Structure formats: structure tokens, C-alpha cells
Amino acid sequence: MPSFDIVSEVNLVEVKNALDQSNKEITNRYDFKGSDARVELADKIMTAYADSDFQLDQVKDVLLGKLAKRDVDVRCLDYAKVEKVSGNKVKQAITVKVGVETDLAKKLVRLIKDSKLKVQASIQGDAVRVSGAKRDVLQETIAMVRKEITDFPLQFNNFRE
């Protein structure tokens, strides 16, 4: 029985490379001279530091540009609230979301079941496994999911006959 997995994966090596490039650009830019603007990575959480809210937005713009150039989908980023640090400085945590969260997985399963296509969807950890009798029906399912879910980056892999 043919099947495939719906997953959400992010290449963390590319995220680290984009972060390094961002820090290099921030240290060399004239408008950041003498400031404490930087981006740090710890596990899957990036933290952007700056002297003001305006500079923080500039740091995030640089980071998003570098991530986009390295083919990292920026829809997988989750922004926390901006926090005041000592003095006038601000910081913001940016989480890289990896894997299909349970509420999104339930939404995917419900969407697939409501579509009346002859496929079965099941949640397996941080992925959704979809299996069906025919390959054509699975391809229709992929097209339908791509059309319906646009706010979160999804990949379709492990396609088996």
C-alpha cells in the first residue's frame, strides 16, 4: 500500500550559517557601530540583541534575509515578546519550529478525512503518515494539503510504493 509522510524539517546547519553571516554583517555595518547588536543560537532558539526596538527590527531583517538566501523557510520561526534588558537594551527570542506540532497534525488529519479521498492519515510522533490504495490519490492529497496549509512549511517525504 503506497504511503508518504508529512513532516516539517529545518536544516539547522543552514540556520547556523545564516546566523554567522548575519553577525558578520551586523559587526561590519555602519549603523551598528558601537552598539551591542548580535544574534546568538542556543539549541533551536535564536536570541536577537540590540540597543533599541528599531535596531532590533534591523537585526531581524538582516537575519531573515540571510535565512531566505540559504533556503530556510522563515515561516518556521516563532517570535517571543520583546524583553527589556539592562539599561535601554532589548532582546527577543526566536524559536525554530521543527516537526509537525500535535494541533497542526490533528488539523491535517481532519482536513484529509474531510476531503473524502480514499486515504488514511495517522499521527506518528512529529509526522503524519498518509497511506492509500493508489499513487494518484496520494498525489491528489499532497496537492490538496499544499493548497490548504500555507501558514506552516511542510515537506512530503518517504514516498513508498
From Swiss-Prot:
Organism for this UniProt entry: Laribacter hongkongensis (strain HLHK9)
Keyword terms of this UniProt record: Nucleotide-binding
Stated name of the protein: Nucleotide-binding protein LHK_01423
Gene Ontology annotations for the cellular component aspect, listed alphabetically: cytosol
Gene3D superfamilies: 3.30.70.860, YajQ-like, domain 2
InterPro entries: DUF520, UPF0234-like_C, UPF0234_N, YajQ-like_sf
Classification via SUPFAM superfamilies: YajQ-like
Family to which this protein belongs: Belongs to the YajQ family.
Job of this protein: Nucleotide-binding protein.
Pfam families in the record: DUF520
Entry GO MF terms: nucleotide binding
NCBIfam families: PRK05412.1
